[in-house]
Amino acid sequence: MEERERIIHLWFKMWLTKQDLGIDDIFEEDVTYVESWGPKYHNRKMVKHWFHEWNTRGKVLVWNIKQFFHKGDQTVVEWYF
């Protein structure tokens, strides 16, 4: 669980700093990433493209984690902007 939380914190930090600090290390090549409001990205290349493109025009000012939920091999994060 600690490793999962470390990875999630790293992912949030990437958005806050607008830096790819290891997308290749935290996502498998065949990842499916679903945003909280619906859009899906079907592979690591698309996730990286979305990350880099979004960060050319936007900035995440605050992204706080309220709590983690762990069940088996799944982890869910409650967060707020």
Predicted features along the sequence, with ranges:
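Small-side-chain structural scaffolding
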Residues: 14, 31, 75-76
